[in-house]
Amino acid sequence: MSLAAFMTYLDNNVTNVAIPTIQRSLHLSVAGLEWVVSSYLLTLAGLLLVGGRLADVYGRRRLFQAGMAVFTLSSLAAGLAGSGGVLITARAVQGVGAALLMPATLAIIVASFTNIRERTMAIGIWAAVGALALAAGPVIGGLISQHFRWGWIFLINVPVGVITFAITARYVDESRAPDAIRRLDLPGLIASALALFPLTYALIEGEVDGWTAPQILGAFALAAVAAAAFLVIEARTANPMVDLAMFRSREFSGGTGTMMIWSFGILGIYFFTSLYLQQTLGFSPTKAGLAFVPMALCVALFAAIAPRVEARAGAHRTVAFGMVLMVVGLALFARLGLQAGYTSLLPGFMLFGAGAGLMNVPLTNAVMQSTQAARAGIASALLNASREVAGLLGITVIGAILRTRQSAALRAGADPVHAFLDGYHTGLLVTIALLAAGVAVSYLTLRPRSAAPVPNRESLALGELATVDELAVPSPAGLAPAAAVTRNPAVP
């Protein structure tokens, strides 16, 4: 499961540094380059709920292997692509494969580890590997594009995919929902896709086409109508794709909301901090990617120790404290100016990474305990989808705030660099406020229902645990924002 997570996370941001090389090789237009990135994100986000429900109905291992096969073969096609059309199509199919396999990864972990300590350790490893993929993506992409043919950024997935498929076939048992809830809700599947596809499209393309463009307004309208239809269908269906009663759980709703706040903040800031490093401090793309390595390593380290902290302090305190560390890290960034050196950046990176790593495993465990195991796949898919959409919203909203402040500074006579820095700092302050609200949300919704102490979570019922989304990766698509670094013409 960790190998699969590494591969899909890596594919979200490994293309960033290689984009100029791909453009020269395939003679792509700017619009074509955008779709090399966007096609993957569009199909991934649009089909996550479908993948999660199919995993519950037809078997988590089966869907995982199907997704892995699709992802691996499409990686081969992308690596060998000789034209922009073939590459964009292959990237879209990669997103389909990722949408099938990702919801199944944590559902399989839940089914495979019945002991809470072992399960928490497995989730910590999963999160740490994802964080390492974040760090490795820009570095691997830069090295490959500099020394080898760009296609190898996709071809490296092929042996990993084959090995993962073989390991899964040999060592992973099949699991699925009980027969009573294994009927496929086809209208719900269609409505969910019709809601997520246009919403994702509008969030990706709105900045380029203009938020009032007919196609963007139409996409938002279609998403709203489809989402309303989805809720009506799910409320009236005997065997719904998504049991709306899941959201009556304080832990599930609060945990999902906390993850959305986390994703909104971390993915938006990841994107604009990349711009700050390159456009204000003069970092090269590869150097900017390397600058995030200490943060990703802190995510991995603190994800590994988070279970011990949670066992002593409880999930609500651990998650809230992790978000406090993230707030402090961003506050340090808000103090940086035009002449900041890397030693000035490092404390903020490390605190932010430590907080992100510390909060995600306990957050995942808390949400897992609020959901029936039979709904593991769809619970994972819901959190994946909410994380994807929240991350894109983070880029969109923080970007709008940045550009508004930047424009005001330019009108006041500031030079472009100072104007961008002013907008960046404003975006940081808004994100700090949002994460501070997340501290309260997580503490209040994840606290135990009884007054009993929570030093040992093994007393909790193990048979009703479920799963969650991509944990500790500021990826993210994991790393949807990192992918977007190359495609926002409105930022200087």
Give the location of each predicted region.
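Short, Lys/Arg-enriched, Gly/Pro-containing loop segments at transmembrane-helix junctions
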Residues: 177-182, 239-245, 369, 410-413, ...
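C-terminal module of multi-pass small-molecule transporters
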Residues: 58-68, 84-85, 101-105, 112-125, ...
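C-terminal membrane-cytosol helix-exit motif in multi-pass small-molecule transporters
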Residues: 158-177, 193-205, 222-237, 438-448
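Small-residue-mediated transmembrane helix hinge/kink sites in multi-pass secondary transporters
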Residues: 20, 52-53, 141-142, 200, ...
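Transmembrane core module of solute transporters
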Residues: 1-43, 149, 187, 212-229, ...
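Intrinsic disorder in cytosolic terminal tails and internal cytosolic loops
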Residues: 178-181, 445-492
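Transmembrane-helix bundle of Major Facilitator Superfamily
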Residues: 1-170, 304-305, 313, 319-327, ...
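A gly/Pro-rich, aromatic-decorated transmembrane alpha-helix motif that marks the paired
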Residues: 128, 132-148, 197, 201, ...
